[in-house]
Amino acid sequence: QECSEIIREMDPTARTMRIITTCNGGEGTDWNVIQNWSGTYGGDVTKYGKELSQKNQLLNGEYGAWRSIDLHTEPGEFEANGVWSESRMCQLMETKIRLAEQAKDSVCGQFQWIFSSHDNPGRRQPDEAFRKIDKVGPFNYKGLVTPWEEPLDVYYMYRANYVPAAKDPMVYLV
């Protein structure tokens, strides 16, 4: 109720509001943002650009991919139910970047969830891991850097796509 009152005070023109809940049984609050997790929790990642272009989809406020710590696989076709490797994460995220850039005239923006993989107290992870080591925490492993702030392959992929080489050149060897 307190969050609803704050939102209403900040934007008295808002006719509808998103559901406001506590997260994972915790004491904090959260309100739902527009999300598109195609390729991560199901759905077809190749339709991401078309989904962003829909009239009711002006912004994607959350998208990402699971990964398994330091697990690498050989490149190949994207597999929707493939191994949650660093390589698959990069492939999924780069597909979303490419399709979002193609749809940029139809959408005001998108942002990736989340910069840093983080501890997620109260969250049970019985099925959200590929290997037992991924259940350490529990952590949300969708970040561009590890919980210890080590950049991942996907971090460098984003940097290569969004930081001009003329401004800040980089070489990344895998």
PLM-predicted stretches and their roles:
Residues 1-153, 158:
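Substrate-binding/catalytic cleft of secreted carbohydrate-active enzymes
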Residues 157-174:
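Surface beta-strand/loop "capping" patches
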